[in-house]
Amino acid sequence: MFLVRTTLCPAGWRTPASVKQGHSVSEPTWKRYLVDYNEGLGLVYERLVLNDYLDRLLKKHHVQTVLEAPLFGMAGVSGINSVHLAKQGCDVTLVDVNAERLDGIQRIWGELDLSCRFVLREDLTHLPFDDDSFDLAWEWAGLWYLPDAAALLGELVRVSRHLVFVAMPNRLQVGYWLRRILVDKEFFKTVDERWVNMGLIKNALEKQNLRIVEEGVLDIPPWPDTVMPAAELLRRLGIRSKRLERQFSGDDWQWSTMDYYLGKRPELKDIVDGYSFLERIPLPWRLKVIWAHHRYVLGSKR
């Protein structure tokens, strides 16, 4: 079954208890960030440089209708990857497998005063949309959580009338292996690592007759990608320093993309731009791959 919600969440709205919960993506973590918007500098950076890429995509291609399916993958606050597209006037549809999370995301979009179509769908091997329904279908960093990522990629191609954009963590970068070998080994027992292989992703898309028109790297700040707050990373590395602990925690260390979207901290974009020199260096992307946090492909049906 699927549940479509096309308006902002009315007061008192609740998901029916009969709706079965779908896939779990570190439930305690995503539940926390439905109410705690302090994501950390790394995630604010990731979101805002992704927005820059999406802006370039909108300038180059005619994109009015957008599907993000599934909406999970990026850490931090769930369901806000497509907020910038909505702010640019796109008609956005989001798909999730978890009713509780989708309820929270609908409330978050209400805080932003943005409209969006919210779709609850447990079975991602067949999305509830007609062929050629969206100008852009995309997914960020969620494939390795899925029981059948290849089927989802096929569905993104089917429902797109033009573009398909897919990004995944870059397994060639230093932070990936720091996380995998040293600081977060247990996480990798919960995902299907085959789907960080960009060759596998491209092959799956090309089998659906999608033409790959661009590939590259995104999210290249001057720090490694460990997908955890700096204070937690120091703790797991056994580094105990009250000075560093104070520096990377407390009221003075607050980083919230929601604050940026709500107009509370407009200076965050300038801060991110100050760190994004590696994104802008005019070098081939293959030379940046050892440090870039994500790799992506863009395909076209035309």
Language-model features and meaning:
Residues 162-195:
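Conserved class I S-adenosyl-L-methionine
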Residues 192-215:
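Short alpha-helix
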Residues 150-165:
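A short glycine-rich, Lys/Arg-flanked "PGG" loop and its adjoining helix->strand segment in the class I
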Residues 1-38:
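N-terminal, positively charged/glycine-rich alpha-helical extensions of SAM-dependent methyltransferases
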Residues 65-126:
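Class I SAM-dependent methyltransferase SAM/SAH-binding core
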Residues 43-65, 80, 84:
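Conserved alpha-helix/loop element of class I SAM-dependent methyltransferases that forms part
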Residues 211-263:
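Conserved catalytic loop of SAM-dependent methyltransferase domains
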Residues 135-147:
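A short SAM/SAH-binding and catalytic strip from SAM-dependent methyltransferases
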